[in-house]
Regions:
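Acidic/polar alpha-helix N-cap and adjacent early helical turns
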Residues: 145-157
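FAD-site-proximal beta/loop scaffold in flavoenzymes
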Residues: 25
């Protein structure tokens, strides 16, 4: 999604990220969006959260929504992890509802009914919580740091 208009700032205040975000008068938001035939715009993902696996794109948001539709899942975040053959693969980080006894295998079977086989995460990690910003958005950079402690062999780019 790119934006341009008189209401769009021409630069970030004292921020070196201006060069990446502002190009030729356009603000590159970092969002992936689709436009309906009626002209409505729907933001579907963030470019930094898309997972490129074997040349195909996997939406982390769609996987998160599929996982969170399971009745025993409280919340879920999906991140890309490096893979020697496929470049990146999804890793699901899941917080279960209190008292849940669902297993990885049961969650995978649940996902198999909802997404393409190549979208299935390589692993599911159960966590007590997913780090969030002050407004409740997932802090995926912090989540990657936490996951690297669990999987020290991973090197995030």
């Amino acid at each position: 999604l790119r934006l341009r208009g008189p209401w769009i700032a021409s630069e970030y205040y004292r921020d070196e990220r201006t060069a990446d975000a502002m190009k030729n008068g356009w603000l590159y938001t970092g969002d992936i969006a689709v436009r309906s035939k009626d002209g409505y715009i729907k933001i579907t993902d963030r470019t930094k959260d898309l997972i490129k696996s074997g040349g195909e794109w996997i939406s982390s948001v769609d996987l998160e929504n599929a996982l969170m539709s399971h009745p025993e899942v409280f919340e879920a975040a999906v991140i890309a992890v490096p893979h020697p053959k496929w470049q990146e693969r999804p890793l699901a980080c899941v917080v279960m509802k209190e008292g849940s006894t669902v297993t990885k295998e049961e969650l995978m079977a649940f996902l198999e009914e909802q997404v393409a086989k190549w979208w299935l995460p390589d692993d599911i990690v159960f966590l007590d919580e997913i780090p969030k910003t002050s407004v409740g958005k997932f802090l995926k950079a912090k989540l990657r740091e936490n996951i690297q402690e669990i999987y020290p062999q991973l090197t995030f780019g």
